[in-house]
């Protein structure tokens, strides 16, 4: 075998080894799930999540808790 043939065989072997080693890397990649980023959107807001109602509900819970912890003055 001459030197050029040996060099050609060596380069071919290196390319084949690189191709074999790099193939599993691309197979490990997985696309992320769609998660309904387009579907399932609602045009109107849900009345349960309106900012005014949320604040009113939080205040109501706080008033009830404070009334239970700090009762009013006793009447004689």
Swiss-Prot record:
- Where is the secretion signal located? 1-27
Summed up, the tissue specificity of this protein is: Olfactory lobe and accessory lobe, olfactory globular tract, olfactory lobe cells (at protein level). Widely distributed throughout nervous system.
Q: Which UniProt keywords apply?
A: Amidation, Cleavage on pair of basic residues, Neuropeptide, Secreted, Signal
Q: Per the record, GO CC terms? A: extracellular region
The primary location reported for this protein is: secreted
Q: Where in the cell is it found?
A: Secreted
Q: What processes in GO biological process is this protein linked to?
A: neuropeptide signaling pathway
List of residues that carry Phenylalanine amide: 39
What family is it from? Belongs to the FARP (FMRFamide related peptide) family.
Job description of the protein: GYRKPPFNGSIF-amide may be involved in olfaction and contraction of hindgut.
Name-wise, this protein is FMRFamide-related neuropeptides
